[in-house]
Amino acid sequence: SHPEVFGESVGHAWYEYPAAMGDAKALHPWDGITQAKYTGPKTGTSTEWKELNEQGKYSWLKTPLWRGKVCEVGPLARYIIVYTKAKQNLLPDMTWAEQMMVDQIEAVSKVLNLAPEVWLPTMVGRTAARALDAQLAGEMARFFFDKLVANINSGDTQVANMEKWDPSSWPKKTRGVGLYEAPRGALSHWVNIENGRISNYQCIVPTTWNACPRDDKAGHGAYELAMMDTRVKVADKPLEIVKAVRSFDPCMACSTHFFNAKGEKLRVVTTDPYLGASVEA
């Protein structure tokens, strides 16, 4: 629970921490605060940005930090980690899934006639890793489905451990965390509970890791690094930038709530990949 191990800073995000603490300091998610402080763009209006204030606050995302470093998460990160550890003999007893990841990378390298370190850490490599990950997920789904069927056939129909589910058995103050390696990358939910009710809830989702604004000490997030030094052929049609960002498979808000300065809800815009967008007054 130490912020130097795992925390979020808001130095360049449109949020603020208590004045005595300062926005540059990282807070652990269990101590997280989500207090909006929208300062607007450097030039333009609050609704029509022309230039963001890169030296100040410029993003609605906080900056997650792992041991003081920004990180890229997702299929590319997983494949690079597993492949590197395998080649450095740090995985003496590889699982079948890890072996499959190594075999996938080497198969692509053979087709491209390029070493993994050449094609993998690129936009194309990031996109390819997502496709390879989908193939791996299919094999893993079949593996665990077979185990589920075997359990049911043996009479084991339990699907969850309910021993600690009853809130009346909890201490007056407690906390918990859910950690999961989602398809897009590292996902964590952090909750504080007092008297059986949630007192604070913080989420750090994969796109927050990748799309975060820079940290003055740790540097730029993955999106920003991917865009830097990228040549754009047509300035007002930056297709190269769009491709770079899309390679991360961004998870954008599917429901956006608009509030005025008094905290009154103005409207809700919900998007659906099949039905399009709907607006509620």
Walk through the language-model features, giving the residues of each:
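Metal/cofactor-centered catalytic core regions of large enzymes
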Residues: 1-281
